[in-house]
UniProtKB/Swiss-Prot annotation:
<feature type="binding site">
    <location>
        <begin position="279"/>
        <end position="289"/>
    </location>
    <ligand>
        <name>substrate</name>
    </ligand>
</feature>
<dbReference type="Pfam" id="PF17810">
    <property type="entry name" value="Arg_decarb_HB"/>
</dbReference>
<keyword id="KW-0479">Metal-binding</keyword>
<dbReference type="GO" id="GO:0033388">
    <property type="term" value="P:putrescine biosynthetic process from arginine"/>
</dbReference>
<keyword id="KW-0460">Magnesium</keyword>
<dbReference type="InterPro" id="IPR022657">
    <property type="entry name" value="De-COase2_CS"/>
</dbReference>
<feature type="modified residue" description="N6-(pyridoxal phosphate)lysine">
    <location>
        <position position="99"/>
    </location>
</feature>
<dbReference type="GO" id="GO:0006527">
    <property type="term" value="P:arginine catabolic process"/>
</dbReference>
<dbReference type="Pfam" id="PF02784">
    <property type="entry name" value="Orn_Arg_deC_N"/>
</dbReference>
<dbReference type="InterPro" id="IPR022644">
    <property type="entry name" value="De-COase2_N"/>
</dbReference>
<dbReference type="InterPro" id="IPR029066">
    <property type="entry name" value="PLP-binding_barrel"/>
</dbReference>
<dbReference type="InterPro" id="IPR040634">
    <property type="entry name" value="Arg_decarb_HB"/>
</dbReference>
<dbReference type="GO" id="GO:0046872">
    <property type="term" value="F:metal ion binding"/>
</dbReference>
<keyword id="KW-0663">Pyridoxal phosphate</keyword>
<dbReference type="GO" id="GO:0008792">
    <property type="term" value="F:arginine decarboxylase activity"/>
</dbReference>
<dbReference type="GO" id="GO:0008295">
    <property type="term" value="P:spermidine biosynthetic process"/>
</dbReference>
<keyword id="KW-0745">Spermidine biosynthesis</keyword>
Length: 628
């Protein structure tokens, strides 16, 4: 591809459209990372090499904590601008729900951005224990999820310790528990109520909002709750209105519709006498994983400023119309804060190339299917390409049927495949996406004629949403982008599971069933980056085939370059076996017994013992040595 350029590389992998300025390509063909808008760009391959020199192994999760601060700052700036645009004086707090990524390096980095404009959310007792320690003095903590007395008591203790904890009532039964514990501790609770909106944002997570939502009160339940509360000493404690429109909302109109409905609840509760000082709109702010800037479920058709404006404007108008004091706006946009900051790097372990096909020598006793396929191949440059492929499919299917019925032997069966794939390659060379009639056949051929790149990672551990909900993540080779990719491939992981594959790829501002990739060079490692994996993936990852957590590093970038600020070793085999109930002492004893029973020479026995011990304490993934 003689016209290949760095701009062509950027376009092929849609980098400008999903990277949001944090990732680019340099003159050496390396993916570079720029954590701060005005800061230096660092080569991702160089960072990985430095991490490996320090002892890290592939697959490797690379975190850039500076991006976390940048994302939070952009979100706060967008709301500051929207409040100025709409003359809104209520203020704004960006709350981080730590369920998105509970790792100390993530939640702690965000929590270090002290100030009234940041808070934390917990949805369980372990999460609450973390945020009680992470929160700044006087910090906002939103307490969601199912609650028992202990959870409620811990949240109320947070109030006693000077934290601004709000216990959000999401089930009618929770209110009495909160009031009983508040009286027992002699503390005035901060109460919130979660409304179940009828409006919801379309998408993969749409049932987290709307009438089918797992949490939240109906209008009747909210009225009953207020009646139970208004005549108590805690009537003025109901200060937070919470709702959730959905996660990863693709269409900005869904946000506007949800806010229109939610604002009505704020007005009505205020009219009834509730002192609503905070409106928590939940999550919903999406990430453009695809780079298509569309209403597709893995994309968004809006930006930060549009999102903020659609939140602020309805509340500003309602407060002005009804003479209400503007409440403090709270969002829980954890995905938008964290997705960009982490990249998974994994090496290709093997490539299975697509069949090239060939034309076998002719024989007088050839079955009819082979004769017909040979005739089709001879006419590749003469007849319409689509018509030729359709005929080839027919005779290929006839040949497969004949083999299954025992009418032809294995040699003939192999020749049928050889001819079919030779025809397929010849047909594809004549097709063009510019011709509408060619596109269905070209799509089919691109799916058939692809290489399988076996990559040293687990889909289920590192990008589980790919398997669970067909989530799309940008995938890019982290080097050689100054070379034209000559192959098309699909990515398969190391698990013994046919679902351990990536089926959808970001390419040229669209989606495809395969990805342009380079052929492997002997002795060189070919490393692939999985981007925007900082939200949910680590936390949701499972241990299929006992592949565990990967090695991870945190990289700090400043004006002088970068440094590996922190390194965490991934799971080893003994850790995974212990997790699923194996007694390590028993395993070691069994190995020793079997070595002894083999009656080997002492030196050989020691070699086997050392190899088994190394296997037991080693990384769960494959060696990351270059192929060839």
């Amino acid at each position: 591809m003689s016209d290949w350029s760095l701009d062509q590389a950027r376009k092929t992998y849609s980098i400008p459209h999903w990277a949001d300025g944090y990732f680019d390509v340099n003159d050496a063909g390396h993916v570079v990372v720029r954590p701060t808008a005005d800061g230096p760009a660092v080569s991702l391959p160089e960072v990985v090499d430095a991490a490996r020199a320090a002892g890290a192994k592939l697959p490797l999760l690379v975190r850039f904590p500076d991006i976390l601060g940048q994302r939070l700052g952009k979100l706060q700036a967008a709301f500051a601008q929207a409040q100025a645009d709409w003359d809104y004086a209520g203020g704004y707090t960006a709350v981080y729900p730590i369920k998105v990524n509970q790792h100390r390096g993530v939640a702690g980095t965000l929590a270090s951005h002290h100030g009234e404009g940041f808070g934390l959310e917990a949805g369980s007792k372990p999460e609450l224990m973390a945020v009680l320690a992470l929160s700044r003095p006087g910090g906002l903590i939103v307490c969601n999820g199912y609650k028992d007395r202990e959870y409620i008591r811990l949240a109320l203790i947070g109030r006693k310790l000077g934290l601004q904890t709000f216990i959000v009532i999401e089930k009618p039964s929770e209110l009495n528990l909160v009031l009983e514990e508040a009286r027992a501790l002699d503390v005035k609770p901060g109460l919130g109520v979660r409304m179940r909106l009828a409006s919801l944002g379309a998408g993969k997570w749409q049932n987290s909002g709307g009438d089918k939502a797992k949490f939240g009160l109906s209008p009747r339940q909210v009225l009953d709750l207020w009646k139970s509360l208004r005549d108590t000493e805690y009537a003025d404690s109901l200060n937070l209105l919470h709702f959730h429109m959905g996660s990863q909302i693709s269409n900005v109109r869904d946000i506007a519709n949800g806010m229109r409905e939610a604002t009505r609840y704020f007005v009505e509760l205020s009219r009834l006498g509730a002192k609503i000082s905070h409106v928590d709109v939940g999550g919903g702010l999406g990430i453009d994983y695809e780079g298509t800037r569309s209403r597709s479920y893995c994309s968004i058709n809006y930006g930060l400023h549009s999102y903020a404006s659609n939140i602020v404007q309805p509340l500003a108008s309602a407060c002005e119309e009804h003479g209400l004091p503007p409440p403090r706006i709270v969002t829980e946009c954890g995905r938008a804060m964290t997705a960009h900051h982490a990249v998974l790097i994994a090496n290709v372990s093997e490539v299975e190339q697509a069949p090239e096909g060939r034309v076998p020598d002719a024989h007088d006793d050839e079955p009819a299917a082979i004769r017909h396929l040979r005739e089709i191949h001879d006419e590749l440059d003469v007849r319409p390409a689509v018509e030729l492929f359709q005929e080839a499919q027919h005779f290929h299917a006839e040949g497969l049927s004949a083999y299954a019925l025992g009418q032809i032997d294995l040699t003939h069966r192999a020749r049928i495949d050889d001819l079919f794939y030779a025809i397929a390659h010849g047909v594809r060379a004549r097709l063009s996406f510019d011709e509408k009639s060619h596109r269905p056949v070209l799509d089919e051929l691109n799916e058939r004629l692809v290489d399988k790149y076996f990559v040293n990672f687990s889909v289920f551990e590192s990008i589980p949403d790919v398997w669970a909900i067909d989530q799309v993540f940008p995938i890019v080779p982290i080097e050689r982008l100054n070379e034209a990719p000559q192959r098309r491939g699909i990515i398969a992981d190391m698990t013994c599971d046919s679902d351990g594959m990536v089926k959808t790829y970001v390419e040229n501002e669209s989606l495809d069933s395969s990805l342009p990739l380079h052929g492997l060079n002997p002795g060189e490692s070919y490393r692939i980056g999985f981007f925007l994996v900082g939200a949910y993936q680590e936390i949701l990852g499972d241990i299929h085939n006992l592949f565990g957590d990967t090695d991870a590093v945190e990289v700090a970038v400043d004006g002088t370059g970068y440094r590996i600020a922190q390194q965490r070793r991934g799971d080893t085999t003994d850790v995974m076996l212990d997790y699923v109930g194996y007694q390590l002492d028993t395993l070691r004893a069994t190995y020793a017994e079997r070595i002894a029973a083999a009656q080997l020479p002492p030196e050989r026995a020691q070699e086997l013992h050392d190899a088994l011990e190394a296997g037991l304490t080693g990384y769960t993934y494959l060696s990351d040595e270059p192929l060839g």
